[in-house]
Amino acid sequence: MKTTCAYCGVGCGIRLSREGDNWQLQGDEQHPANGGALCVKGASLLESLAFPDRLLYPRWMGQRIGWEEALDTLAERFAAILAESGPGAIGIYLSGQLTTEDYYVANKLMKGYLGSANVDTNSRLCMSSAVVAHQRAFGEDLVPACYEDLELADLVVLTGANTAWTHPVLFRRLQQARARRPELKLVVLDPRRTMTAEQGDLHLALKPGSDVTLWNGLCRYLLDVDGWDKAYVAQHVSGFEALAAALDDPAWQLDEVARSCGLSRSDLLGFYQLFARTPKTVTLFCQGINQSNQGVDKANAIINAHLMCGRIGKPGAAPFSMTGQPNAMGGREVGGLATQLAAHMGFGEAECDRVQRFWQSPTMVRGPGHKAVELFEAVHRGEIRALWVLGTNPAVSLPDGNRVREALSRCELLVVSEVTANTDTARLAHLLLPAAAWGEKSGTVTNSERTISRQRAFLPLPGEARPDWWALTRLARRLGFGEGFAYEHEHEIFCEHAALSGFENDGSRQFDISGLAGLTRAEFEALSPLRWPVNADWPRGRDRLFEDGRFATPDGRARLLPLAQRFPEQPETPLLAGAVSLLLNSGRLRDQWHTMTRTGHVPRLQEAEPWPRVRMGAASLLALGVKEGDLVRLCNGLGEALLLVGLDEGLREGEAFLPMHWTDSQCSQGAVNRLIAPVVDPLSGQPMFKQGRVQARAQLTRWQGIWCGRGEWREPVDWWARRPLPEGNCTLLASWSESTESLWQRLGAEGHWLRLPMKEGWLAVALAGDRIEGILLVGARRPDIKVDLLASLLGTPLQAGALSQTLSQALAGESRLVCSCLRVSEQRIVDAITRQGVSELAGLQALLGCGSNCGTCLPEIDKLLIKHVFLASA
């Protein structure tokens, strides 16, 4: 059985085998994306299926109901709202976690039958700026490259992307290519010195938001040194004269660009020279480019440089937008954005007429609907009365999170299709619908290189969980649209989607998979990965687009665009006493996914970064008077967050980084998007998640503690953060309003506890009979403790000797996990170096296995080798 990973946009293939009742998972060696490799998230997919709060039945207002009642209620409410307020009062919010078939049915129902374009997706938050940039430059949303181009290039530029963490398998492919071909150079453009930047030949830590300046400067440099391809521009590109005139501005001269970007002249010149002399260049860009007040312009600035040099449509040469989710591309194909119609068609009269004739639908939208941020504003003001959210968690993932939660709580009818009831959004729903999870649902997904792959079901549907397309189809039938939604299998939906892509397509739309429209069900079930287009001209798919220099514009030419630098307005507010002003960046951790609905309950994925932690530079820590592990409060006019603080020497001073993953399920005050203003790109509507202005202050506490228990910590405290353990959970605790004695009085009144004094504070053991149910350590500062050792006591009989011995070992302190794949800690690596004499990477890999799988920990291992081998011998 073969399927596709549920996580990032690399789209790795997975092979499953069954031994008795147990499934085994490994990478698919034949899949073109990964060739058998998997990162730690992909390798732990089977573990993720054990959802602690799996939603198995529909619920209305918290009460279990059947599907018939749920769908009848939904249809009645939708029909009433449509009759009273019209189609604009209905909205659907989708996800890049859905299959293409789910997306297609939702889009068709909304735009062709209900007559509402208020259907958008969380891909708006990650890829919509790239979509608009492609449309402006190429005439259509087209990714011209494939992953092989990274291996064939002589220069790879990674910008706005910590690829080593966010797309580990693809980064590993790049690193392996560099090992085979040392002439392949890697340049990383990123304000942070990330794990990706650590491995580059050159890292340019440019000023946040200055990307247009840097790329305009490159284009100006190419003109100055005659480093552009005159013949290619003359034959295949329009807009050169306007761009050249705009680049004549002194702002784009080398010295001024270096100053504006905060870079040394020599580093910037080195990059420009390298780019100018390297024909085989791939520029890979991701959220650091897209999630901006001018993400579209940033992407077009990159594309400008490639078009000027003719570096597109050739092996090893292309601008390459990486998607964040497994099916963000599929959503774009079907028109799952409010600014698209369907199958890469817009809202022109001829296009609307074409799609309506194909669907034979009773109505058709004639213009775009509300983009994501606008959509939830429309909910807030009551314009959208009913909202159906499928497979995403907007209460956490959208900017201005407090206002979004307020909008959701005001919504007249909030429907949420989810695999678990325990998300911040699901807890606000009136109607909860149990969705099929990865491994239970079947369909197709498209990755960043346009590869369509099958996602196959290998598990039965639990309880009354159903695929999302099934629920949408049954609603459509109840609303009287049965003829248009007679689907009984995802194969029928896919074939219709494929047929629409080729309908009246004379070659003007390069998204065309009509060659798959006639698949039998058996052929669909056996479909192997292939890149679109798939049609009469390209029956086996196509690796690269634009080889012939023809683009999807009316004149067949790509477009160069003059671009201006626009920094976001960042109004400074008076500093609070003891506060430090910081520019807040947000992004991903290596081992987590989105809002942790799928990964947050998997213990081994928590080990490398178990707690919500904001990282900042040494000067900021000093100014705040805090040390690593202390609590820091972040605030601005939108909201607050309270987190542990950590040092990151790779950050520019005055800047901070906070992961996006934490929700109210894992931390009392950890959601970063409560601090992010709803500033969006005016063209794409994509929010600016990378540049929030906050103030940071030290949070003083009366006590801090840590709880390891078989059950969750239930007592109210001022602050908490929770992580799962194989048997139970671990929770950090802190209070500034209550004394430790008051806490003990509450505990002693409610259960069987044994309290023991410690050097600084006390330890309390919760008992069930003579067995340990939980252990609480409390003191002025939280102890640094080996959680796994403490957890080993859970469920065991209380024995003073065992408790004392284990506690003394646990208090020796936790060693940071370096290699998540093989679960190798920093201390084990250091011991191998200092005690066993291992002095090189190959020796560590042979002894411990660290760094031998996805490779994202290699920079950290290199640092440890430098510190404990080379510096020790110096």
What are these regions (language model features)?
Residues 91-99, 259-263, 286-293, 325-326, ...:
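Conserved short loop/turn motifs at secondary-structure junctions
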Residues 104-175, 182-189, 196, 212-216, ...:
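Extended redox/cofactor-interaction regions of prokaryotic respiratory oxidoreductases
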Residues 147, 439-461, 472-478:
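Glycine/threonine-rich phosphate-binding loop and adjacent beta-strand/alpha-helix elements that clamp
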Residues 198-206, 434-436, 440, 451-462, ...:
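Short beta-alpha connecting loops at secondary-structure transitions
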Residues 462-464, 468-527, 595, 599-615, ...:
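Long, contiguous, secondary-structure-rich segments that constitute the structural scaffold
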Residues 685, 690-693, 697-874:
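Rossmann-like nucleotide/phosphate-binding core characteristic of flavoprotein oxidoreductases
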